[in-house]
Curated annotation (Swiss-Prot):
Gene name in the database record: MT-CYB
Cellular localization per UniProt: Mitochondrion inner membrane
UniProt lineage: Eukaryota, Metazoa, Chordata, Craniata, Vertebrata
Coiled coil: none
Pfam families in UniProt: Cytochrom_B_C, Cytochrome_B
Bilayer-spanning residue ranges: 25-45, 69-90, 105-125, 170-190, 218-238, 280-300, 312-332, 339-358
Protein name as catalogued: Cytochrome b
């Protein structure tokens, strides 16, 4: 047998013959990461991390830098594509019970948290109205931490308010964190190839395996072509589709936007935060909205790994997806009835999934 590493040899990397298109999102995420890192590198050459020049430097990139508009729009739309792929990737993991591969799942959760932090820091960099106020609201949540809160917030801001030092350190963090994402992604992939991919049926994949190349690599290339075509179509026709109109105005600490909200991919967490009237409670709920994913490998009770043959759990899963979309929608609305109530109910259902799921698994075992 050849001494080549499994990841480098196509013949030594057999994959289950029945893995579906839902297994293509890993390679799509890798493509998004390469795209974001390369466009970000070129943008960093022209960007200026100064509160007086940041907004103007972004306009300079769009107007004066050759093909700067392609770089800037690809980077902005690419972030949305990244999160669409991430959320589908996580949903696939929940549906097919892939979280039982604990190391891969937990490293993936760490990746998600790092990615969210990176995207948040990046959203602040253009120094538009929504960038500034979203940063103010989210970083201010640190003050909810007992005893250390105020000190931590002052340390993060680099002063007693969001100012030039804040933007400088956010740029530094936004530049350095992608390298941590690349490292964590490598760990994630190595841990996955330790055991190999699962399949939609949740059966032993060793029974029927085929080489990754050409069978699955061509399938990957097709989905990647569709994704890149979609990205460039959005960039060409509606480049500001995911942008907030408020962010076309330069940051002004004296004027508060009517409705402060982060980018669409954080709205589910922001909606959960807003649904709780207590600051500390809201902050904990915000953290738990992501951290609760780490509990799934330890609360799985069903004898069957995948949800493919579990209709009760399937119903619960699709309720979770509907809840996720509902919270995202309510977070775009003002804090007033009926949106407060809808948001609170949706948040309860969201967290209930992780409690009811193991109970349903146990009930299904009894019914078999």
């Amino acid at each position: 047998m050849s001494n080549q590493h499994t990841l480098l040899s196509s013949n030594l990397l057999p994959v289950g013959s029945n893995i579906s298109t839902w297994w293509n999102f890993g390679s799509m995420l890798l493509t998004c990461l390469i795209l974001q890192t390369s466009t970000g590198f070129f943008l960093a050459m022209h960007y200026t991390a100064n509160i007086n020049l940041a907004f103007s430097s972004v306009i300079h990139i769009l107007r004066d830098v050759p093909y700067g508009w392609i770089m800037q729009n690809t980077h902005a739309i690419g972030a949305s594509m990244f999160f669409i792929c991430v959320y589908i990737h996580i949903a696939r993991g929940l549906y097919y019970g892939l979280y039982l591969n604990k190391e891969v799942w937990l490293s993936g959760t760490a990746l998600l948290i790092t990615l969210m932090a990176t995207a948040f820091f990046g959203y602040v960099l253009p120094w538009g109205q929504m960038s500034f106020w979203a940063a103010t609201v989210i970083t201010n949540l640190l003050t909810a931490i007992p005893y250390l809160g105020t000190t931590l917030t002052t340390w993060l801001w680099g002063g007693f308010s969001i100012n030039d030092p804040t933007l400088t350190r956010f740029f530094a963090l936004h530049f350095i964190l992608p390298f941590l994402i690349i490292s964590l992604s490598s760990i994630h992939i190595i841990l996955l190839h330790n055991e190999g991919s699962n399949n939609p049926l949740g059966t032993n994949p060793d029974i029927d395996k085929i080489p990754f190349h050409p069978y699955h690599s061509y399938k990957d290339m097709l989905v990647l072509t569709i994704m890149i075509t979609l990205l460039f179509t959005i960039m060409s026709f509606t480049p500001n589709l995911f942008n907030d109109p408020e962010n076309f105005s330069k940051a002004n600490p004296l004027v508060t936007p009517q409705h402060i909200k982060p980018e669409w991919y954080f709205l589910f967490a922001y909606g959960i935060l807003r649904s709780i009237p207590n600051k500390l409670g809201g902050t904990l709920a915000l953290l738990m909205s992501v951290m609760i994913l780490t509990t799934t490998p330890f609360t799985h009770t069903s004898r069957i790994r995948s949800m493919t043959f579990r209709p009760l759990t399937q119903t619960l899963f699709w309720l979770l997806i509907a809840t996720f979309i509902t919270i995202t929608w309510t977070a775009t609305k003002p804090v007033e009835p009926p949106f407060i109530f809808i948001s609170q109910m949706a948040s309860i259902i969201y967290f209930s999934f992780f409690i009811i799921n193991p109970i349903l698994g146990w009930a299904e075992n009894k019914m078999q």
